[in-house]
């Protein structure tokens, strides 16, 4: 059985849940045209999504996906050879390449490395909260949720403080929603939309910067994580220069974008639920369990990174040819009433660690999940202890994206 192509409008980027309710009622997988002009088979069911994320017949190799996206869009995406190399990392590779890359990177991302960051994250959170003191109104994204992960990840890799704002701008442009053919009156002035040419230019600039950073660090090895990646080896195997560039890009971008949203979305959920806010303020030991529920309820990633059918497959009775794109909606899967008793309510405990798909599943499970959890836990502990009466100052607007799920800003009155 095949399915007709369903066109998803711009509103899907801001508020996808009504769309997912309709799709789920019709079946677990659908052929959709995303607002960015790319068609994909979209899975909205938890169990099927979990299976697809771990399926060997569904590949992630960037070199195989690139011609498929070009064919589906009917045009080249404007990426150059230099910028395309940024995407050749472990998240866009299949075994045995993926196995090799993850093994090497894991040597630098140990539990010991994460544990050693605890004091620095605490100090950073305190410093940021000190800066807010006395302000009538603050934006918790710009003032708190963003600085924590971007500072931590940049310090880990030795990215100079003077370069971090530009890095953040380039990251935002590269991960922005396609501005071509989008029906959104805000697209022209929003930093969360970008043309193919703008994304390509940002990719080239970032790639050039990373090449220079790696060259400088190779000559001046230190204790930072980049130095560890340069030195990482397994039985004589090391990351090549191109692999280092791609891996550094992946960790720097994924290492802050998702955690910003985890902290921001969790704070928004608390600000909308005063009873829960009061409960966690009085019982901070419950914050780790609350974070797992925040990850399920409003996770930091909307739709999984692209996969493709390496051969014809059948999902839930739907025949999908080879060389088609497949995506899993992590938001939809985590709101599946077949998996969660109260999918649209925050219920601490219904999404114990490993019970949601916010960090993915299978061999591509997020290698930075322990760091994200630590940053989020300390961020929540510190701000709840400091500002028990904080409240929303105005309505928030979501970032228009099928990749990330996060608010554009989070204005609050502290007390």
Residue ranges and their predicted role:
Residues 1-415:
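Cytochrome P450
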């Amino acid at each position: 059985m095949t399915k007709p192509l369903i066109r998803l409008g711009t509103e899907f980027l801001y508020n996808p849940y009504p769309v997912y309710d309709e799709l789920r009622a019709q079946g677990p997988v659908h052929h959709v045209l995303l607002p960015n002009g790319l068609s994909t088979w979209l899975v909205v069911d938890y169990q099927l999504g979990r299976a697809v994320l771990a399926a060997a017949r569904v590949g992630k190799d960037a070199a195989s996906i690139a011609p498929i996206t070009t064919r589906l869009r009917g045009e080249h995406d404007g990426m150059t050879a230099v910028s395309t190399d940024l995407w050749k990392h472990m998240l866009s590779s299949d075994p045995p390449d993926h196995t090799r890359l993850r093994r090497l990177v894991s040597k630098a991302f140990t539990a010991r490395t994460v544990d050693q960051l605890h004091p620095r994250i605490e100090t950073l959170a305190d410093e940021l909260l000190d800066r807010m003191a006395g302000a009538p109104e603050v934006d918790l994204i710009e003032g708190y949720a963003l600085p924590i992960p971007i500072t931590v990840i940049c310090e880990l890799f030795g990215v100079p403080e003077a370069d971090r704002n530009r890095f953040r701008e380039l990251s935002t442009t590269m991960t922005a929603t396609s501005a071509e053919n989008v029906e959104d009156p805000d697209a022209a002035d929003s930093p969360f939309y970008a043309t193919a040419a703008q994304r390509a230019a940002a990719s080239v600039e970032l790639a050039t910067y990373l090449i220079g950073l790696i060259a400088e660090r190779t000559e001046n090895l230190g204790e930072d994580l980049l130095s560890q990646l340069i030195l990482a080896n397994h039985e004589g195997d090391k990351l090549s220069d191109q692999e280092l560039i791609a891996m550094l890009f992946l960790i720097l971008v994924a290492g802050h974008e998702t955690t910003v949203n985890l902290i921001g979305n969790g704070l928004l959920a608390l600000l909308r639920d005063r009873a829960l806010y009061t409960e966690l303020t009085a019982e901070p030991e419950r914050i780790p369990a609350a974070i797992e529920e925040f990850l399920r309820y409003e996770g930091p990633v909307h739709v999984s990174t692209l996969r493709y059918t390496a051969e014809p497959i059948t999902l839930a009775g739907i025949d999908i040819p080879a060389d088609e794109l497949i995506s899993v909606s992590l938001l939809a899967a985590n709101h599946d009433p077949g998996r969660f008793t109260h999918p649209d309510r925050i219920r601490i405990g219904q999404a114990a660690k490993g019970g949601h798909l916010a960090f993915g599943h299978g061999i591509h499970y997020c290698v930075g999940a322990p760091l994200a959890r630590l940053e989020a836990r300390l961020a929540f502990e510190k701000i709840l202890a400091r500002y028990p009466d904080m409240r929303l100052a105005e309505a928030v607007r979501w970032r228009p994206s099928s990749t990330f799920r996060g608010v554009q800003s989070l204005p609050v009155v502290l007390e």
